[in-house]
Structures are given as structure tokens and as C-alpha cells.
Design a protein with these regions (language model features):
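N-terminal leader/linker segments that initiate helical-solenoid repeat arrays
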Residues: 12, 20-67, 71, 85
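Flexible helix-coil transition and linker loops at the boundaries of alpha-helical arrays
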Residues: 41-43, 77, 111-130, 162-167, ...
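Helix-start (N-cap) detector for alpha-helical repeat units in TPR-like alpha-solenoids
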Residues: 50, 82-84, 120, 130-131, ...
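Hydrophobic face of amphipathic alpha-helices that form TPR/SEL1-like repeat modules
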Residues: 53-60, 87-94, 133-145, 173-182, ...
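Short coil/turn and helix-start
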Residues: 62-63, 78, 96-100, 122-126, ...
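Structural signature of tandem alpha-helical TPR/SEL1-like repeats
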Residues: 64-68, 99-108, 148-159, 187-196, ...
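TPR/TPR-like (Sel1-like) alpha-helical repeat modules
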Residues: 103-115, 223-244, 270-276
Length: 280
């Protein structure tokens, strides 16, 4: 596996240039998000410990008592528990048992990011912390209508960059790549986009595999590698569903397959077999 990683790294530099290392540099810790916000108010119900409150909240949630879950989770969130902050943020973002409220979701995610940004990437709660940064990036990208959270693409880049580099979050890497590809909040740079897509694609991120494959097939700002592009698109196509959500992946694959000649297809198949074998 180590040999494969070294080969992959060499191919990456050969494809995107030695400047690829820049994309791996850790982003600085973001400045505090919620300096003026009031602390979460603990509900009237008291619990023996934060852990008891969290367990009660998750038990109520799984039993379908979402209101009871919110009360218990608010207690744990008031003590800064990362999972409670994340769960409340997700519930308000999705309207899951509570009235949909993006501002409340933003504030819970902000507290989580502020209080746990230095969490070890190897910790059990790292995934929820990085997920909060990704959610914040999405909120900053478009803003929240009729609230103090305005559109701030540069701040979105900061959120995605931190989660992408410090936590190696594939969703953050994908979103950051999209911003580089579009030139939103950052200077447009297809090579940087390809590097971040590549990092996420290697983790099995389907949309990143599709867009990386498309970039390599078309040579859009990066050296054209049709066979490798078709390989990534094939992986994305195999992982996609036949529903409308993934239709764009199917379309990109069909276009790439039609544009490829027989030698491209054979080499793509060989690369695909190598890729799969290396991960067994």
C-alpha cells in the first residue's frame, strides 16, 4: 500500500505540477465566529451529568420524541458537548422534529467550530467538528436571508479550507475545489481545483471523482489525460444511482465514453483494475 501511495504521489506531481504541495498546506485556525452570541441556555430539567443529558436526548430522539430530545441536547450543548451541538445544528438545518431555522443551525455549528476547532483529527468527534465547518462554509457562501449572516464567499473559503486541510474532510475538499474551479471567493485556479478534487476522489467521494474525471478528459486548465479521466468517471458512474440527483454524473460519463477512442478505453480499464487492486 505504501508503494502505491508513493506511485500515486509521483503521478499527482507529474499531472498537476510540483506546486501540488501548496494545496496540502494546513489552513490557519479560523477567527471566532460567534463572539457576540449569548450562550446556550440550559433547560429547566437537570441531569446528573452532560453524558446523561446526551444519552437521554439520543434515546428520546430515537424513540421519536424530538421535543424531549431537544431539551436534553440543549442541556448538553450548554456545557459545550460537541455531539449535542452538532445534532441540534442538524435538526434545525433539516427541520427534523423542530421548525426549520437556518440561523439557529448556524449558531449551533458556530459554537461547535469555535469551541472544538483544535480537536485532534484522529479523535472520535473529529467528523462532527469538520462537518460543522462544512455547514458553515455553505451558509457563508449564500448567506441566510433576513439575518445578520450575509453572503461572504471569502469566509466560505476559510471554512472549507480549514476542514479540508486540518481534518482532511472529503466534503470540504470537494466544496473548496468547486470554489477554485469557479473562482468564487478565491482566484480561479483549475489546477488547485484538480488537486482538491483528487484528494476527495481518493477517499471515494463520488462527485469529486466525476468532476476530476471531467477535468482530465477535457484538459480544462490541467494537462489532458483522457484514460485517467475516463477511469475516474467510470468509478463515479458505478457509485451513482439512476435517480435525478446523479443524472449529471451519468451524462458526463456517457459524453466521456463517447469521446474516448478504443485505446483510451482499454487503458482506462487497466488503470481501473490497478486502482481497485491497490485498495484490496
Amino acid at each position: 500500500m505504501r508503494t502505491f501511495k508513493l506511485i500515486a504521489a509521483a503521478l499527482w506531481v507529474a499531472t498537476f505540477g510540483a506546486g501540488a504541495a501548496y494545496a496540502l498546506d494546513a489552513a490557519p485556525r479560523p477567527q471566532p465566529l460567534t463572539p457576540a452570541l449569548a450562550p446556550v441556555l440550559a433547560p429547566a430539567t437537570k441531569y446528573g451529568s452532560v453524558r446523561d443529558a446526551l444519552r437521554s436526548g439520543m434515546r428520546d430522539y430515537n424513540a421519536g420524541d424530538k421535543i424531549g430530545a431537544v431539551h436534553a441536547l440543549e442541556y448538553a450543548a450548554g456545557e459545550g458537548h460537541s455531539l449535542a451541538l452538532w445534532k441540534l445544528g442538524r435538526m434545525y438545518a433539516d427541520g427534523d422534529g423542530v421548525q426549520h431555522d437556518d440561523l439557529k443551525a448556524f449558531e449551533y455549528f458556530s459554537r461547535l467550530a469555535d469551541q472544538h476547532a483544535d480537536e485532534s483529527p484522529d479523535s472520535p468527534t473529529a467528523a462532527v467538528v469538520s462537518s460543522a465547518f462544512v455547514a458553515l462554509g455553505s451558509y457563508f457562501l449564500d448567506g441566510i436571508k433576513d439575518t445578520y449572516v450575509g453572503a461572504n464567499p471569502e469566509r466560505a473559503v476559510e471554512m472549507f479550507s480549514y476542514a479540508a486541510s486540518y481534518f482532511s474532510d472529503s466534503n470540504a475538499q470537494y466544496n473548496l475545489a468547486r470554489l477554485y474551479l469557479e473562482g468564487t471567493g478565491v482566484r480561479k485556479d483549475a489546477r488547485h481545483a484538480a488537486r482538491w478534487f483528487n484528494l476527495a476522489a481518493e477517499k471515494g467521494h463520488t462527485a469529486s471523482q466525476a468532476l476530476l474525471g471531467h477535468l482530465l478528459m477535457t484538459g480544462q486548465g490541467v494537462p489532458r489525460q483522457r484514460s485517467k479521466g475516463l477511469m475516474w468517471l467510470t468509478l463515479a458512474r458505478e457509485a451513482s444511482t439512476d435517480g435525478p440527483k446523479d443524472q449529471w454524473i451519468v451524462t458526463l460519463y456517457d459524453q466521456a465514453f463517447a469521446a474516448a477512442d478504443e485505446s483510451d478505453r482499454k487503458l482506462a480499464l487497466a488503470l481501473l483494475e490497478q486502482y481497485i487492486q491497490a485498495r484490496r
